[in-house]
């Protein structure tokens, strides 16, 4: 599904990634661990097409993402990649349901079944009863579940999560862990997660350890 070859990334004179070669297959659950500053989040952002590598190639489903123009890259990201971050970035003026539907609106993919799809995602995540609440009416764990539902609304090929439990208490973090495992095991969702959480890292079928811009799979 994803092949990284010779990936290097520098910001000015600072080299963050020093040559990454790795593959992610459909159905994988990959956890990326390592100390702060090792390049974990940078690598995830490159896979998502949020930033460009200084050297090397990234192929997504056989397509070289570095060769895509901005419109094609945005379309790929909206339709095939689900993104979850430590901070949910929900729009405060929209309800949970409306936040989940955002990728459909942005991609001009709204149709008669979109709301049903969104409600099904919220139900899977255990918060269908919160669909019409604003973000400030939800707990931190509920907000993160809405963010996960939003990432899943277009049925992406891969879910990329950057410290998805970093801002949650242990109970809510464990709930998110369980949801990610269910997505992977029951639905075959490909998951790649950057984490400092040992429990979440241990769930990965593959564990990548990053140190000083290098990866040990």
Residue ranges of model-derived segments:
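ABC family nucleotide-binding domain
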Residues: 1-210
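Conserved switch/coupling elements of ABC/ABC-like ATPase nucleotide-binding domains
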Residues: 212-217
